[in-house]
């Protein structure tokens, strides 16, 4: 995996895999009535086994790549901000994205196990993805339980993956081989990187490793599992099982993390954190989102529109995006008074586990949206037009972006997959 932006060397992670075939035209074709009812047994069937595209959806305006704010972590500008787009609140879902997305294609469970007797005649999918604008490069096997985090430190030639199997695995970016396994003696709830620091959330503590000088620190204080970590300016935030958010301030003189505060307000575990626009956003199992000022660490607003666990949060241009097990992705925008309110709700058929904002090969903004039916959808923004999806053995819990059009997914079976945007990407309708 030579993660060189120029793509000079064709290494493991930059080797383009076999992409899906481009879809045929839908002109003069009809959707199979029996397929819609879930009982078509014809192969080949002369009719379409997918819905016809709706009204034409033009391309999203080229991304401005603006951040919500130019805040920097203690190691410099963060690389985890979502891309922006030139849009306003009324652009969301303009091309029919407000309808509930219904899954119409299923992964063949026998193919996954390597023993499908039907071969090419099988009615179910024998591939890990649908869409011709990205492709699978390679698969990293080794974890025995759900992958809870993926980190690619800036400037490093190593990829780090964490799991509930109590390990962090280290992968060589050039060969794709596992070069080391850290046995931590406890389930890993999350992992992030910031500059030279690798930060790992565990039961009752946060581990901090400096991969440049091998410094090894244990940050005590959390009660229960640490589910989420994020860095804002010189502060490290940890979302914990007891509903509190612990804060440490990085001391550049001593290269240590000094306890700074404990943010109270959530009544159940804090499972998602994000920093943007001089704010900390926290999502919890109590179904709420809290907005905290980074100036004084006070809660300035509580958002209660979700009806189940708030699983993931990202900032995109001037908007906050949140997802929940209530099957929705909500888009929040600030009112004239400064408070956030829902400006658009995108509905899924299943609970939504994780969000990640990326740019495709043409610099268009795309939302990666993982659901608990073992799928990940790719949506153009702000229209929410679907352009492809990724399928997995189990739920995709972790998504991480790398340079050069690379992105990673980790699922409940322990598999980590490496994907890459195609040089020429063409949106499709599934």
From Swiss-Prot:
Keywords: DNA-binding, Metal-binding, Repeat, WD repeat, Zinc, Zinc-finger. GO terms for molecular function: DNA binding; zinc ion binding. WD repeats lie at residues 142-183, 221-258, 265-304, 306-342, 345-389, 391-429. Gene3D superfamilies: YVTN repeat-like/Quinoprotein amine dehydrogenase (2.130.10.10), Zinc finger, CCCH-type (4.10.1000.10). Pfam families: WD40, zf_CCCH_4. Residues 1-27, 56-90 are annotated as: Disordered. A zinc finger (C3H1-type) spans 26-52, 102-129. This is Zinc finger CCCH domain-containing protein 48. It comes from Arabidopsis thaliana (Mouse-ear cress). The lineage of its organism: Eukaryota, Viridiplantae, Streptophyta, Embryophyta, Tracheophyta.
């Amino acid at each position: 995996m030579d993660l060189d932006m120029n793509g000079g060397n064709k290494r493991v992670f930059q080797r383009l895999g076999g992409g899906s075939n481009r879809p045929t035209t839908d002109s003069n074709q009809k959707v199979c009535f029996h397929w819609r009812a879930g009982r078509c047994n014809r192969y080949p069937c002369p009719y379409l086994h997918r819905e016809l595209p709706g009204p034409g959806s033009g391309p999203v305006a080229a991304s401005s790549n603006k951040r919500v704010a130019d805040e920097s972590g203690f190691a410099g500008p963060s690389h985890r901000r979502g891309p922006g787009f030139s849009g306003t609140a009324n652009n969301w879902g303009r091309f029919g994205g407000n309808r509930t997305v219904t899954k119409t294609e299923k992964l063949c469970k026998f193919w996954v196990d390597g023993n499908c007797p039907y071969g090419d005649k099988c009615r179910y999918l024998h591939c890990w993805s649908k869409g011709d604008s990205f492709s699978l490069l390679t698969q990293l096997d080794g974890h025995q339980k759900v992958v809870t985090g993926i980190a690619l430190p800036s400037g490093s030639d190593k990829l780090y993956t964490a799991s509930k199997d109590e390990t962090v695995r280290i992968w060589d970016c050039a060969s794709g081989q596992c070069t080391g396994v850290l046995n931590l003696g406890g389930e890993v709830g999350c992992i992030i990187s910031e500059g030279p620091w690798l930060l790992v959330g565990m039961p009752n503590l946060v581990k901090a490793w400096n991969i440049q000088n091998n410094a090894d620190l244990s940050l005590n204080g959390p009660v229960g599992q640490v589910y989420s970590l994020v860095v804002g300016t010189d502060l490290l935030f940890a979302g914990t099982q007891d509903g509190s958010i612990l804060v440490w301030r990085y001391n550049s003189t001593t290269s240590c993390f000094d306890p700074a505060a404990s943010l109270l307000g959530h009544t159940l575990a804090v499972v998602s954190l994000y920093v943007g626009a001089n704010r900390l956003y926290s999502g919890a199992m109590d179904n709420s989102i809290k907005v905290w000022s980074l100036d004084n660490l006070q809660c300035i607003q509580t958002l209660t529109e979700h009806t189940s666990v708030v699983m993931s949060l990202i900032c995109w241009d001037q908007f906050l995006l949140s997802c929940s097990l209530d099957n929705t992705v909500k888009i929040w925008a600030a009112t004239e008074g400064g408070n956030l309110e829902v400006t658009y709700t995108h509905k899924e058929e299943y609970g939504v586990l994780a969000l990640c904002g990326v740019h495709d090969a043409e610099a268009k903004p795309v939302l990666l949206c993982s659901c608990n039916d073992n799928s990940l959808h790719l949506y153009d923004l702000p229209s929410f037009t679907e352009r492809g999806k990724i399928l997995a053995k189990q739920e995709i819990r972790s998504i991480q972006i790398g340079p050069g059009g690379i992105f990673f997914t980790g699922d409940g079976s322990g598999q980590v997959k490496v994907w890459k945007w195609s040089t020429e990407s063409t949106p499709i309708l599934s």
